[in-house]
Amino acid sequence: MTLTIKEVTQLINAVNTIEELENHECFLDERKGVQNAIARRRKALEKEQALKEKYVEMTYFENEILTENPNAIICGIDEVGRGPLAGPVVACATILNSNHNYLGLDDSKKVPVTKRLELNEALKNEVTAFAYGIATAEEIDEFNIYKATQIAMQRAIDGLSVQPTHLLIDAMTLDNALPQVSLIKGDARSVSIAAASIMAKVFRDDYMTQLSKDYPEYGFEKNAGYGTKQHLLAIDDIGIMKEHRKSFEPIKSLL
């Protein structure tokens, strides 16, 4: 008895590798519906394989440290919010567990919102330790954004419940005695930094969404404090509020 296209599709969708797909008895079924199902499954498997390969690439720096010190406790650190006109700069320090596997981890700006939220929940529930650090708009104005970012990162490290032995940091160096590696575009090169990037992004977006409830005119729930047209028009219309960065243009010139 010939299987229906629906039945064959169910069999195809249960296949876990491209090799298995190509050797499947249904592979030679010439019905268009079956061939379409095979093409869709191949595309999905190729995408999954690419994510696996990227994940392995992004463990390079962690593995380098673990080769020298198998007992190393590696902390990834990243920040979000250096560019906005309002709100804090937020850092996250994250220590992944030893059997981590979060396919799709990447620079938080490249990860779709739904996937970002999914990864954030998994990370919060499963990592060995994580902590956030915040530097306020007032501190950004007092020290400058670079120094404020360092302050936020160190606060995140200080908040960890587990003491790390090594730091992997996105494009920054810290005044910290622990061994550290600063990586340009680290959130796309290290799983530890990428995890911190995701968590910091979700935390700050939530913070700005809450802030928008008190200051709806600025549209913080949509722009996260960046200088969008709506945001700039609101500043022209009603002025600034306490979480605007007075050292940032165009606000600085308005004061």
From Swiss-Prot:
Cofactor(s) annotated in UniProt: Mn(2+); Mg(2+)
Main location: cytoplasm
Any single GO BP term: mismatch repair
Enzyme class: hydrolase
Cofactor binding summary note: Manganese or magnesium. Binds 1 divalent metal ion per monomer in the absence of substrate. May bind a second metal ion after substrate binding.
Keywords assigned by UniProt, alphabetized: Cytoplasm, Endonuclease, Hydrolase, Manganese, Metal-binding, Nuclease
Reactions catalysed: Endonucleolytic cleavage to 5'-phosphomonoester
Protein name, as recorded: Ribonuclease HII
Organism, scientific name: Staphylococcus aureus (strain MRSA252)
Gene that specifies this protein: rnhB
